[in-house]
């Protein structure tokens, strides 16, 4: 075939395949069989193979996958991907509705519209289009940063590689614009069942959401393509759509080629909202995919900024979640787990029962006070409950069903793993194993924490591998990870040479993690990532922190007496100091890096407090803006405070600031100071 003929045929095949994709995924009106579609696709692939210079990123052939991604790079979202506040109570939905009406200005009218949508039980992602072409797909991650999984996103048939309009029209319609589309990736029930059926010798996925989450993080995009997933769009950011109502944006998404689910409705009263929720509580069972609730949004985006957002969620939307599913079963036994800090947690062993699409055999009992409160015994018939992806919990004993041979759950006197006598600190609920350095369960849990995403982020280091490393005496603490060799690791179960090298590369990369993450990774009791940041800001090296007196630590912003005591005790423990020295030898960052270049110096040296609610920024975002300009957010107000930024509904700090003579500004003036 001549090149000009190939070009013409390739263009025809692409247009046809894109049209069939749209009819199948968006309109649910397929015109041809899967076999006929595959035949057309194979012809396109063959032509592109013969003329490789004609391959384009938006070609349907690029959905087949085949790219191997060794590591997903991290990307920063243009706007934070906040989750919605959620409730299981219709009363709280009504309170939300009334609260929004009260906060809206008069021009919103007496009965502003809300949009009710189905809440898909999937994995949130963000898609970025430039000039009409898909250039990036990213996971939500922590809301600020996510993983770039573009090769895997490209394999999803309901994700347009090019926004509808054709190549010629794309430049005209979308040229010079960046468009962001957010939504959920999910798996249909029949596709999920087929996936599990094709894994007879492998562990079965618990539910479609777990299967979707796991599939999106696979490194082989060809395998991702084989697992059928869908994308439902629910949010559009487009410079040309700013004046559109939310429901109009959903319709615009459909015009662009996206699947939106279609089951959304505008509501002008709470009665209409309640009817929608009630109708779908029943009708959702007929769908071919899982939904776990209803999302309610104010229809007019012009008022979204007016209502603002908390640090976690917008005030103009809420998610109503259908009540948690429950099931009855028998509590056969109780086992005791040991956490990284030695906490003993009772876990119920249950007679297997189906709940929320999964088979449940275990459930948490939290602690021994909870066991007493429930008055639960071994042999009892109990009710368990599961909300979303939360671990199932025992919520009550079924009245009148207790057997004569039921037995009380005894508090163990010794650690179930290492046999050390347990301790029960005064004024604490939990019991602890004090054998922190030699108890295998604690050692393994600490290493897993050290390797976790927010700590050292050592990919490939999972529970089974840590189990082997500890059991075989290769590691006794987190510092030993940096002494592992390829020969040692490759001899472990399911660890070929390639897997061993991948692990060692991940460990090597972790040496560059920031000082604050190393502090968090140490696993100091009561020290989360936010506290680790405060400590790193106050003490620029671990040596300064280790030598700090208890009184000094107590004066650090947001570090109370309990945390101060915990940090102080940690650095007076010889085993902890030995671990720090191992990490120093391994080359980890035990001191703060040189500060990043400032955007400007408008807040240089200033201690700033925020009170009330800011409309344009979350509290964390505002604090970051101040830090980028040389200032620092503080929590405690005193005469040494330089500035108080007062948002809506400020607290008592405003009055205190006025009494102390501290400068107070509003959000508008704060915005002006940024530039």
Swiss-Prot record:
Q: Which GO terms describe its molecular function?
A: DNA ligase (NAD+) activity; metal ion binding
Please indicate if the UniProt record lists Magnesium as a keyword. Answer: yes
Q: GO terms for biological process?
A: DNA repair; DNA replication
User: Which cofactors are named for this entry?
Assistant: Mg(2+); Mn(2+)
Q: Which InterPro entries match?
A: BRCT_dom, BRCT_dom_sf, DisA/LigA_HHH, DNA_ligase, DNA_ligase_AS, DNAligase_adenylation, DNAligase_N, NA-bd_OB-fold
What residues bind NAD(+), as annotated?
34-38, 83-84, 117, 140, 184, 297, 321
Reported EC number(s) for this entry are: 6.5.1.2
Which residues are catalytic? 119
Q: Which residues belong to any copy of the BRCT domain?
A: 598-675
Q: Which Pfam families match?
A: BRCT, DNA_ligase_aden, DNA_ligase_OB, DNA_ligase_ZBD, HHH_2
Query: Which annotated residues bind Zn(2+)?
Result: 415, 418, 433, 439
What SUPFAM superfamilies is this protein classified in? Answer: BRCT domain, DNA ligase/mRNA capping enzyme, catalytic domain, Nucleic acid-binding proteins, RuvA domain 2-like
Q: Which PANTHER family does this entry report, sorted A to Z? A: CHROMOSOME TRANSMISSION FIDELITY FACTOR 18, DNA LIGASE
Q: What does the record give as the function of this protein?
A: DNA ligase that catalyzes the formation of phosphodiester linkages between 5'-phosphoryl and 3'-hydroxyl groups in double-stranded DNA using NAD as a coenzyme and as the energy source for the reaction. It is essential for DNA replication and repair of damaged DNA.
Family the entry assigns: Belongs to the NAD-dependent DNA ligase family. LigA subfamily.
Protein name stated in the entry: DNA ligase
